[in-house]
């Protein structure tokens, strides 16, 4: 009888011990998690997932880990919102602004308190959700990618000067001097600097700014100084086939080799102001069904400290959204950091006229320039 009672006690201890072992060794997702939805293979996705894994290793068991949930594309992620919702979404400002307009985002400024990231006013003024329910990490902008050997001694400080330099180079070598990967963003940026709004619609062609830009491009296309060959403009500059090219930052090489550099897109004229078109990427706070915004704000406070957000932006070839104190010897990183001057970064919403007309404008301007080049 005593033996039977002893075995019963031992069995009970084993069960209790098993429960205890399970409680302290169970996987993190059994405790719940901060869910982050993202498009697999999208901008910043791989780098963000790696950073989130680092966060999970650094926290105590009292904090919720981050669980990254991939989707095949934007449509698949949008469809998932019909039945469920995450805590955070890694997305561009286009999606974030749309969600904000439909009341789908949750402000967590109070939960962040003094840990809220500070953004330049020129950026934070783009939307009320920035810094409250949407937290940009970086932005893609157009830059001038330059072959320093071919452009040595040539004036690239304005679009007018660049056009003139292209004609000189064409006369000297018989070769094209520059190219542009996309024209619509270039027009948008130049309009912004001239104090006008570019909607990419047909009425835009009546603007003096449009005619000024178009005439410069048209002359260069007619003489062959502007390359209209669609392809890898970055490789052409690196190989010495072009002196420079207007490209997006995500098209730049991961490392800048000797003989190339990155400059801001030049203003139309010396009297031009500041501003540029950007596409921001960051985290939108949905927090639907979340037990607390405390864990979400703890993760965001961690992300936007110790230059982690800056490094994440630079790793994905974006201009950091916030002014950075990061010191680096990497030439590309230094160039991207220098591009954040606190000037106006225009972030048009997805339902803007520019977004609606952009593709048609791009096709039209390319067709016009190609006709002149024949």
What residue spans do the PLM features occupy?
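Conserved N-terminal structural module of periplasmic/extracytoplasmic solute-binding proteins
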Residues: 1-95
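Hinge/lid segment of periplasmic solute-binding proteins
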Residues: 91-145, 154, 161, 262-265
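Short, solvent-exposed loop/beta-turn-alpha elements that line the ligand-binding surface or hinge
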Residues: 110-118, 195-212, 267-275
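Extracytoplasmic/periplasmic solute-binding protein
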Residues: 133-137, 142, 161-203
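Glycine-centered hinge/linker elements that transmit conformational signals in sensory
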Residues: 199-231
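Long, aromatic- and glycine/proline-rich binding clefts that accommodate carbohydrate-like moieties
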Residues: 311-367
């Amino acid at each position: 009888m005593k033996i039977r009672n002893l075995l019963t006690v031992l069995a009970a201890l084993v069960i209790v011990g098993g429960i205890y072992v399970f409680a302290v060794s169970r996987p993190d997702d059994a405790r719940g998690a901060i869910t982050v939805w993202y498009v697999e293979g999208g901008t910043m996705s791989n780098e963000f997932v790696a950073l989130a894994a680092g966060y999970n290793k650094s926290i105590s068991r009292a904090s919720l880990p981050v669980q990254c949930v991939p989707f095949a594309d934007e449509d698949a992620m949008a469809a998932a919102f019909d039945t469920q919702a995450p805590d955070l979404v890694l997305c561009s400002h286009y999606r974030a602004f749309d969600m904000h307009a439909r009341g789908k985002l949750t402000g967590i400024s109070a939960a962040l308190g003094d840990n809220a990231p500070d953004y330049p006013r020129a950026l934070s003024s783009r939307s009320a959700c920035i810094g409250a329910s949407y937290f940009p990490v970086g932005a893609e902008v157009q830059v001038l990618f330059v072959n320093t050997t071919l452009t040595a001694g040539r004036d690239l400080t304005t679009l007018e000067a660049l056009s003139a330099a292209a004609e000189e180079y064409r006369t000297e070598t018989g070769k094209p001097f520059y190219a542009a990967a996309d024209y619509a963003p270039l027009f948008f940026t130049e309009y912004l600097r001239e104090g006008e709004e570019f909607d990419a619609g047909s009425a835009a062609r009546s603007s003096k700014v449009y005619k000024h830009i178009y005439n410069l491009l048209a002359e260069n296309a007619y003489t062959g100084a502007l390359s209209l060959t669609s392809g890898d403009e970055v490789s052409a500059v690196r190989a010495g086939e072009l002196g420079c090219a207007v490209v997006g930052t995500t098209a730049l090489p991961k490392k800048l080799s000797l003989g190339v550099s990155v400059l801001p897109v030049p203003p139309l004229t010396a009297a031009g102001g500041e501003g540029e078109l950007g596409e921001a990427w960051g985290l939108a706070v949905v927090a639907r069904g979340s037990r607390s915004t405390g864990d979400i704000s703890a993760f965001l406070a961690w992300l936007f400290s110790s230059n982690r957000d800056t490094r994440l932006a630079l790793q994905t070839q974006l201009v950091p959204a916030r002014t950075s104190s990061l010191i680096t010897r990497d030439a590309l990183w230094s160039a991207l950091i220098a591009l954040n001057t606190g000037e106006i970064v225009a972030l048009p919403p997805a339902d803007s006229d520019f977004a609606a007309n952009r593709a048609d404008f791009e096709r039209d301007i390319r067709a016009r320039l190609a006709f002149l080049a024949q």
